[in-house]
Amino acid sequence: MDFLRQCTLIQVMILAITIRLTHGGWTNFPESCVQLQPENAYDEMCDDSSLTNSNSIEYHNKLKSTKKFCILNQIKSVKTNLYRCYNISITSVCNSELSSQNLHQDYEVNPISRRDCLKHIIKNWNDENLERSLIQKSEDIYRTRCNFLKNTETKIEDYIIYQEKTESSVINADGLDSMIETKLIELESNKKLDNTVKTCISWEQGGDSRFNTLNLIALDLNLCLAKNSYKLEKCLLCYFFIGQDKWYRGEDGFMISIELSELDTKSIPKCEILWYRLYPGNLLTINQDYLAKKVQERNRGCNAVKSILRSGKAPPLENMIKYTIPLQAGYGIGFREKIEKTVYSAPLRGNLVERRNYDFFRCHYFPSKIKIVENKTHTPPINLCVYHFGKGSCHYPDNKYFISMNPVSFEENQHYPKSGQSFDYQSGLNGIRKKIKNQEYYIPDSFLMTLIYSSHTKSILEKTNITEVFRNDSNYENHTLQDYLGLFNKEDEGMRPERDLINLPNITSETEDDDTSDLNLELNKNLINKTSSGFSNDNSNVINIPSKEYNKTDIKTVGKINKTSIIINHEEKDYWHEEYNMWGLSGLSFLLLLALFYNKIKRKIKRKS
């Protein structure tokens, strides 16, 4: 009997461990959700270019035979985002007399070095708008308010980050100033590989189906991209296979290349470095075709559900859970079920009718593990503990009730396929329902994401070896990563993009008065060009810009400069404090009354005398 009891105890322990592992599966967890109108949400649902698309998964095992990667070195045309930084100094002089008032502003704009510019970009990395526009800021903090009968001089020191969108015919791997949109790079892998670098083509140019089957940014390398899209991390650096540091802002889809010598990585908060091997080794142990089939089923189901939603009907909750929750890290569309109750009235009776509907949200999704834990310091004591991928400690999400809905119940082990059995119903994103101490939680445990992330997390974090990196040039085939990085220290201006142009907006002020006269904007640009013989000065003409016709497209392009001064003389009086009008009216009234009172007293004195 004791032996049977021990066996039973072991079975119970195994079952408990199994359930705990079930809770430890991977999911795409929503954070920072903002509610959307349904039509706007439908447009963003079912993103087929997710991290786990069928092309990435079905042929990912071909990477095992790939010995070398290459970078896309030259294409016909590519859109490039360049960010440049400038220091701005604004001196405002208020001249106030009884006869006249005038505000004189002097703007000095100077280019900032690339090193300092990178620091500014780091500082503003998580802002919704990385670009700090001089046009926008000139309407608020840069506007000086003058006081009546006070001559004052104020100076403001600040900086701006200005974006330039250009179109280039060549992408250079050494273009250190370029912020290049992330491109899907593919490698022809179905031919016999030797020690030479194969052809690289862009995703859009891959007309042959053989090129459309391998996505080098999928899974292993994509986990690096996914980590960098998290707003919870200030930043993350990855040494990619082209030997450069890549700085990603994943939600915008572009990256910045920086020199190692330009920036000390220790000064960047919350950063870590992942070293990636050129040869990935064994990537997946699961059946590629099986996983690809499940992703394809999920995509078809999601589009079918979206069609039902667009028709004005409400699909069953289990189908919404199964097909619509995003697989991709970053921004995606989530939902919450709601029950709408309406009263149907008849002549002699009335019925209460319930109707299912959904609220939609745009959330920032994180591949995460979720566990139910008991924490007596929280109310209620049962809560969700979320482990985001790439972050060690768990946290308790603010919007935990976003997933604390009332879903369809599933058996706790149904969402994992049993050996030798077909897996159909739970092919998408399903969940389990667990009830603990009268508190019910829905754990959106994803079978697909569990297969993908659990197979890669450990191996990806253990890749610390520095191995060979090759440029798309046979002359660099035998160079190591350190040799390649050493090339950055060489002065090769021919490999770098032009950095001499500066785009400056026209500075104007706008008032709420519709009858405001046009601004007389005197633009005195002192263009100082540093040449071999010294400095030379240029002066531009005076430009009159109607304030109401001003828009963000009014941009002046200036040539090579080291300093630009913009002097603005405002003729309208909206720069005066509101107290000025009140003080002026009350002051004049007081003086008038005082004069009348004085004359009255003077007359009385004369009469008495």
UniProtKB/Swiss-Prot annotation:
Extracellular topological domain residue ranges: 25-581
Known glycosylation sites: 87, 375, 465, 472, 478, 506, 529, 551, 562
Recorded topology in the membrane: Single-pass membrane protein
Keyword Signal: yes
Location within or outside the cell: Membrane
Keywords noted in UniProt: Glycoprotein, Membrane, Signal, Transmembrane, Transmembrane helix
Family recorded in the similarity comment: Belongs to the ephemerovirus glycoprotein family.
This protein's name: Non-structural glycoprotein
Organism: Adelaide River virus (ARV)
